[in-house]
UniProtKB/Swiss-Prot annotation:
It catalyses: L-seryl-[protein] + ATP = O-phospho-L-seryl-[protein] + ADP + H(+); L-threonyl-[protein] + ATP = O-phospho-L-threonyl-[protein] + ADP + H(+). It comes from Pyricularia oryzae (strain 70-15 / ATCC MYA-4617 / FGSC 8958). Residues 156-166 have a biased composition (Basic residues). Residues 1-140, 156-184, 251-286, 408-615 are annotated as: Disordered. This is Serine/threonine-protein kinase MST20. Residues 122-136, 271-280 have a biased composition (Basic and acidic residues). PROSITE patterns: CRIB (PS50108), PROTEIN_KINASE_ATP (PS00107), PROTEIN_KINASE_DOM (PS50011), PROTEIN_KINASE_ST (PS00108). One of its GO terms (cellular component) is incipient cellular bud site. Residues 634-885 form the Protein kinase domain. Residues 13-26, 63-72, 79-97, 516-548, 562-576, 587-596 have a biased composition (Low complexity).
Amino acid sequence: MDGHSNFTQPSDTSHASHTIPSSSSSQRRRLTKKPPPSTSARHHHSSLSIDSRVDAQSLVGKRSSTSLRRAPSAPPARTPTSTHASNSSSPRNPSSSTRLNNHSPIIPAASEFAASSLSPSARDRDSDPARNDHGHQLQNNNNYYYSAFTNAHHHNQYSAASHRRSNSYGHPHGPQSSNSLTFNHSEDFIGAPFDGSAILNRIEATKASPTLGSGAFPHISNPIPVGAAAPAQYSRGSPALEQSFTFPSAAMSEKSQQVRGMEAQLPTSKRYSDETKEPKPGVLRKKSGFSGFMSGLVGTPKKPLISAPENPVHVTHVGYDSATGQFTGLPKEWQRLISESGITEKERRENPETLVNVIKFYKETTEKPAEDQVLEKFHDARPGLPSAPSAGSMISPGLAPHHYNPMSPMISPPASPRFPQVGHEGNFENPRSPPPVPKNKDVTLMPSRPAPRPPVSLPTRTAPHAPYAAKDSGIDMPPQHDDLTPTTYQPPKESQPILPEEHRSRSNSRVNGNTAYPASQQSPAVQAAYQQQLMQQQQEQALAQAQASMSGSMSRAPSKRQPQAQQPTPPQSQHQYSRPTDANGAQQTQRPQQPQIGPVPQSRPRHRSRQSNGLDVVAALKRICSEGDPREIYRSFTKIGQGASGGVYTGHERGSNRLVAIKQMNLEQQPKKDLIINEILVMKDSSHPNIVNFIDSYLCGGELWVVMEFMEGGSLTDVVTFNIMTEGQIASVCRETLLGLQHLHSKGVIHRDIKSDNILLSMEGNIKLTDFGFCATINEAQNKRTTMVGTPYWMAPEVVTRKEYGRKVDIWSLGIMAIEMIEGEPPYLTESPLRALWLIATNGTPQIKDEGNMSPVFRDFLYFALKVDPDKRASAHDLLRHEFMNLCVDLSHLSPLVRAAREARAQEKARKGQ
């Protein structure tokens, strides 16, 4: 060959030099990789030079290499093959007639060859110049490789289909180079076991042997022992290659598998000259071999094992089949609620999605875990409280027994719908009178107007809070003072039957409380937070109730809503506090619920939260609380309510003799201590003439004392229940309420529970907002909220339908409260809570019974306040500029209404024999 062939040994990067005998002269040639021939002429020239230079002398030289002889038991020694020797010239792949990379095979002379045969595949390959070039180059590239690793190279220049066993080495001139056959690459390494000594011997022999003349094409191989049959062509993948008779097929097959394993380890992807298939199939085949080798070596990668679900929770999915007009996947409880709600089939078909949202909202706001039930603000707290205390026991002369009676109604049995119960429990829905223990009967406390029947599930919710009654003792007050007047504490049995409805009407309205509860239900952590909030709300409601009861507005016991809200709460003041607490709790719970849900554990979140947050909360409280003992600053404590974590009292400030409301809480019983801090901070920042103001707070002996302004007149509920108000008086109440809301909204606070129960009056007619338990804070980043809180009957449509809402929810509630002042009760109060929610969601703006008797200005005021679309609804600032505000009267005109309400309640109480 004219070109140099450079071969790289697998184990050595150095170039090997071969000394090959030549008929003319010896020359050491450095074999370098031959560049692909550019013309067919070069191939032709190479073939001619091979024919002319290969002679018997070269073969004799090969036979004289005694150093390469092997013992009978030793594997055949490996010798370097000529650059054109077939890669398969090994025991398994004896060289068959090799072909040159020319366009047509060269026929050897008859004197030089005994026989020569080309297989059809070989001939086909010869006919393809590109393929010949490729095969020729690869063949050259592998000859040296095999010279080092094959034990013997048997060149069978002939034997195609005839399988003739003729030894090509027996001829003086072997035509090995005349025709180069291609072999399956899988046979590259087939041969005897690897022999390192043979390789070294071969290297020495090559150095000692003479080289061929320039241009000669070496094709020498080791001599075959006498008697050894010349191996025949063998190919696994091509009919052109035949199996040697010298080796059994089984042994060859075994060796072939070993060779394939070695090939698989080679990173090279080149195609060898002995491949009989197209390059592409060859690559695919090698890839398959590599994959198989790697899978056997590394093993099949393990697939991730997915276990079965642990602790699965079934979540009900309710759908609606428009074809049949029926709900799908409706739980039995929901079916019962729908059937008992009074929602007709026609209504269901018209608004199926709304019904689903309303039911979900109702369930979320009414169902709570057992923990929450225990925390329900004033539910069984009353039993522990003595009902005997007389009005005289009350420190404030303004507080009459009848005032306390209203509180009893508030205690109305838990039979009231869930919503009412929520109000009872911890909400200050009826701040005027905290709910008495259900056991006590208070006929006088029965509300004058009927309330809707409580939902079946709601009654169960009323959980006794009696265990908390002992907490009140923390104030060291005489039982008489602790207890409200007998009327106040007497559990209204009658009120139980009547109050359930009444309470539901007002207390049920306390959906907020329920809402807070549902949130807690959803998450134990939330539940714990809600419980704390309820306790706080209960206390706040108790204060409000106490204030209302003392002012006489509590006498409004007839108002069925208040009794319901108060049922869960203890005394009136308790109810007030409890409400704020409940409301606050609900609101705070919702706000805190989000952050606190994580920290609070499920069943015992309270304890854990206390343990984890106790020290931090106490430290924070010490920073914001005043030093000193409240018992030394205030005197004449009178208990007016009971909450889950403490009681609500009235007291007089020493020196000034100012009457205040005191909320006492046992920190150890507070599941969410951080909520307390939030409530105190909100109250401190909400100082306004139309907001019940925060006076001071003390941390004493593990108990937190919160001192607030006390409103003797009680809540607006008593006023609207026992009196008919003029538009001027209604306008005055709306104005004062709007001023308080404007202040809250300016600070990014949403009250979320505006209703008559949370509007307190003084004996002079001053009006202030209370019960901030459900307050929520919004900011630029979060100007909408989605938590469901508030009282069902006063709720805005966007809240009922579980949509985002903002400050405008308070405006809607104000409009409903205006209707309440007109009609004595809010719309849908006689409906079950679920149906009320349904009507709010579907009817939008409620219809006023005697709208014709209202002035156009008043109707226009309500028109803007009760817009279903919150974007079109007026703001507090807008309504304060409405013409309706021109009808406002002096607040002193409200004083007679407050006194009349107190008297009416006292008379009602007397009629009941209490």
